[in-house]
Structures are given as C-alpha cells and as structure tokens.
Design a protein with these regions (language model features):
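Non-catalytic C-terminal accessory modules of carbohydrate-active enzymes
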Residues: 88-209
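Active-site core of glycosidic bond-cleaving carbohydrate-active enzymes
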Residues: 1-134, 138
Length: 209
C-alpha cells in the first residue's frame, strides 16, 4: 500500500489530510479520517496513542456541531463511541437520533428524504455496544454497556470467525453467555476483566458463566 500512515496533528487529533492543514470546517459531518477506528480496525486499545487521538478527534468534531446534520453521521458517532467503549456517550446519540431524526415509523429522514444508512448504522452501533470482534482472535462482550441497559439479554449476535453470541446480564454484570461456532474454530472471549479461551467443533457451543 502507498497510503501514508495515520498521523496525529498539532491539536492532538488525527490528521484528516496528508499535511496538517488548518480545518476550514471543524464541525463537518464527514469523518473519513476515523475510518481506522470504525468500521476498520487499525485503531484499537492496542494502539493507545492513536486511540486517544481518535477520541479527541471526535470530541473536537462534536464541539463544533459535527454529527447532528444527518442520521448517518449521527450513526457513525454511535459506532465510534462503541469502539471507544464509551456506552453513555453512545446512548446519548441514540437518544438524539430517535428524538430528532426519525419519523414515526422509525425511518431516518433528512427533511423528507429517507436515508436508510442512518437506520443500518444505528443498529450496527447498538450491536457494537454489546459485542465486538474487530480485533484479531478476540470477541468482547458488553464492551460499551450504558447504565440504562444494566439488565437485559440478546440472542443471535454474530461475531467474526462465524460465531454466534447469546447472553444475559444483570446489574451491569454478565450472567451467562453461549458461544456457538457455526464453522468450528478458536477465539478468546473477553468480558469485564475475565477471559475464556474457546476451541469448538463445527456446530458446537460453550456456555460461559
């Protein structure tokens, strides 16, 4: 690849351009320089300087109003906060989207125009708040769980490696999880300071308590 490496600029944020230009519109709704955080995986907790710079980039964008112009840009913010493991902030933008950008039938609208990417992006963000698997060989459960969701359950969430996750949690703590391997394979499951090494045959499952 001939793409230049990700750089941190003078503001402590990720550079949007090859040169560290002064931003003309610091609150713009497009945030393609954060692609490495979401939906890709070049920026994770394993790259702490970039992880911190990504968070600062988002904070700066939001300070100048970048997020609320469209449903899809709001959905992008939800996913960013999920990847940063900031559940309260993610939930705040879910609520903002529901209050200001959805029609009564839950379609994401820009004026009278239906923009389905807002709906797809927001639901993807909710899933990311509950299960993440973008890091090689790791599945994280409840990585960005907000206080308002402190008790609940989900079934059938998919993870990389062709795993399927069903789980219950109570008072903010994992109660039970079942990991089903559709194809067979290994992975590590991480949740709230605990780790499990999983090695399953095709069609087999393992319950974590």
């Amino acid at each position: 690849s001939k793409l230049p490496p990700i750089k941190i600029g003078k503001n402590g944020t990720l550079q949007e351009w090859y040169e560290d230009y002064e931003e003309v519109e610091p609150g713009h709704r497009h945030m393609s320089h954060l692609y490495a955080l979401y939906p890709s995986n070049q920026i994770t907790q394993a790259t702490p300087e970039l992880f911190k710079a990504a968070e600062k980039t988002i904070e700066r964008r939001l300070t100048y109003g970048g997020a609320g112009q469209t449903g899809w840009s709001r959905a992008w913010i939800i996913n960013f906060f999920a990847r940063l493991q900031k559940g309260e902030e993610g939930l705040e933008h879910i609520h903002e989207m529901m209050a200001t950008q959805l029609s009564p039938n839950m379609f994401d609208l820009l004026g009278e125009i239906f923009q389905i990417e807002g709906n797809f992006g927001a639901t993807a963000g909710i899933a990311e708040m509950l299960v993440q698997s973008h890091e090689e060989g790791i599945i994280r459960l409840l990585p960005a769980l907000p206080e308002a969701w402190n008790t609940g359950k989900v079934k059938g969430l998919k993870a990389r490696g062709n795993f399927e996750i069903s789980m219950e949690w109570e008072a903010g703590k994992l109660k039970k999880a079942e990991i089903l391997s559709i194809s067979g394979g290994k992975t590590k499951v991480v949740c709230q300071g605990k780790e499990w090494e999983i090695n399953l045959e095709k069609g087999a499952s393992q319950v974590l308590l």
